[in-house]
Amino acid sequence: MVKISKDTPLAELTFRKYEKPNSLKDRELVRKLCLSLGLLQPGDSRDVVVDVFQVILEAEEPISSLEVEKRVKKNRENKGLEQLGVAGSNIRRQLLRLRSLFLVEKTGSLYRINEGASLKELFSDKIEKYYLDSIMARVREYIDRADKFFKR
């Protein structure tokens, strides 16, 4: 019997290019940032990650997941958005997604923007230099292997 291996990636990145963000602000700016970073799918109505990220960006001090949940619910209510995906378990899942991209860090039970750095620094140092470089190196290994295997 043939064994079928699982095609589970060790790491995955999705980037999207949109129009320049000149006039965007508040939630719409964070939404486009989430779309650009692959945290949100185009047309996805389950967009609580936008609110979670915005709450963390606006927080002046590290905050707990319970406080994130409370602020997300309040923000969605103020904007007339449905209270979909605001359960504590989903808020923690979204925080984990933000942590996996090195945008948010958890210290004890509190969350903040990673190292209190700017998003530009985090993108450059963590995503481009670390995450993207390691993915690109592995893709190059597959390309080299394919070139050797399928000689022309």
Which sequence ranges carry the predicted segments?
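Basic, amphipathic "hinge/linker" alpha-helix immediately C-terminal to the N-terminal HTH DNA-binding motif
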Residues: 110-120
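Short, amphipathic alpha-helical interaction segments positioned at domain boundaries
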Residues: 118-148
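Short amphipathic alpha-helical interaction segments
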Residues: 81-100
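A short, conserved structural fragment
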Residues: 96-110
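Short acidic, hydrophobic short linear motifs in intrinsically disordered regions
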Residues: 62-82
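Eukaryotic partner-binding/assembly regions in large regulatory complexes
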Residues: 1-17, 126, 130-134
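Short alpha-helical segments that sit at the start of domains
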Residues: 15-64
